[in-house]
Regions:
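Short hydrophobic alpha-helices at membrane interfaces in multi-pass membrane enzymes
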Residues: 132, 163-186
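Perimembrane helix-loop-helix junctions
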Residues: 198-223
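Membrane-interface alpha helices of multi-pass inner-membrane proteins
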Residues: 96, 140-141, 177-204, 228
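Transmembrane-helix motifs of polytopic, lipid-linked glycan transferases
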Residues: 104-127
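Intramembrane catalytic core of multi-pass membrane enzymes that act on lipidic substrates
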Residues: 31-104
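Membrane-lumen/periplasm interface segments of specific transmembrane helices
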Residues: 215-303
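Start-transfer (signal-anchor) and selected internal transmembrane alpha helices
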Residues: 1-43, 278-287, 329-339
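Aromatic- and kink-enriched transmembrane "portal" helix at the membrane-lumen/periplasm boundary
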Residues: 92-93, 132-156
Length: 339
């Protein structure tokens, strides 16, 4: 029934696209509807008690922020489910404004509002804007992110918005502003390790085409900004044994074999050697992410059993939602009209 509703929704939105696109001020109606959804998401966020959830992304972020503000090393602290945080340092900055607003879960509604503003400002056909919002709001994985106060998909959506903004501004030369780009790359890499894959696919070819001075500026800038972003954690480092046992890299990758991690870090570099259009980059990215997630899930199932993988969080199935934003962009958006 669910799939029927989704397919019928897309079918009729396309069928009546000419009528939808001719409606006066339709863009403002879409924005207004999006704002109502935003308010609903805010209400849901405050209505649901995070401590009642069997998902701890929100509390991992909350504990990380609270620990850093209190001058403590965050990766040994326990969240409401008794787990230690795997938040990389940049998530501290993303969640900080919402921590001060009283709930880090507000990140998700505000990222949805940002998507709505992006669609409002873009020159995408009105019916395609509606399809984007329809697919997003009909996605169980996205709605789970809202209800569970998870930051995963919001993290990926922020990355996508940055990549398309950068492509729009510097389409002919991604490395025109190497220092600014190095800051954003360092920031996003320090949110989640998996974002290395899309960043490499989108930017590595441009890095190779840049001159030596630009390359050096980017490398030096990336190194300095990475250190600065990590500084609140670096100044509170405990003893070596604690760091080895409790660190975000260990927590994020403990169930995936090292050879799989290395392989999928290297593959984007090889694919990016070819000159690709932005839609082709998204296509290859979807393939890489899908294979990575499937292989990781299969390995965990083989080692620990299907029940442990699925029901005891040996594999976090919410990571499957990573492909959703890229899938929507690939199948719906007209990339020639993103400016």
């Amino acid at each position: 029934m669910y799939l029927v509703i989704v397919f019928l929704g897309i079918f009729y939105l396309n069928k009546f696209s000419a009528i939808i696109n001719r409606i006066k001020k339709a863009n403002y109606y879409v924005l207004g509807l999006s704002f109502v959804v935003f308010l609903l998401f805010v209400f849901i966020n405050f209505y649901i008690d995070g401590n009642s959830l069997n998902a701890d992304r929100w509390s991992a972020m909350d504990v990380t922020i609270a620990s850093i503000l209190n001058g403590e090393y965050p990766y040994g602290m326990k969240d409401h489910l008794g787990q230690t945080s795997s938040n990389l340092p940049a998530l501290f900055y993303i969640g900080l404004p919402f921590y001060f607003l009283g709930d880090v879960g507000l990140l998700q509604p505000f990222v949805f509002l940002l998507i709505s503003l992006f669609l409002f400002k873009s020159k995408i056909a009105i019916h395609k804007k509606v399809i984007v919002l329809f697919l997003l709001l009909m996605s169980p994985s996205y709605l789970w992110e809202i209800i569970a106060k998870s930051d995963l998909m919001s993290n990926i959506i922020l990355l996508i918005l940055f990549l398309f903004f950068w492509d729009d501004k510097f389409k002919n030369n991604y490395f025109k502003k190497p220092l600014l780009l190095s800051f954003f790359c360092a920031f996003f890499v320090l949110t989640r390790g998996i974002v290395v894959i899309p960043l490499t696919l989108f930017l590595f070819r441009g890095f190779l085409d840049s001159n030596l001075k630009t390359k050096l500026k980017f490398i030096v800038g990336f190194t300095i900004f990475s250190i600065v972003i990590c500084l609140p954690i670096l100044i509170n480092l405990p003893n070596t044994e604690t760091i080895i046992e409790h660190n975000p890299f260990n927590h994020q990758t403990k169930f995936t074999p090292k050879f799989v991690q290395i392989l999928f870090i290297l593959l984007p570099f090889l694919i990016a050697l070819k000159r690709l259009k932005i839609k082709e980059k998204v296509y290859y990215l979807l393939i890489l992410l899908s294979i990575l997630l499937f292989v990781s899930f299969a390995i965990v199932c083989f080692k620990f059993g299907f029940d442990n993988a699925l029901y005891k969080s040996y594999f976090d199935i919410s990571y499957l939602g990573i492909v959703l934003p890229f899938t929507i962009l690939y199948f719906v958006l007209d990339y020639t009209k993103l400016d």
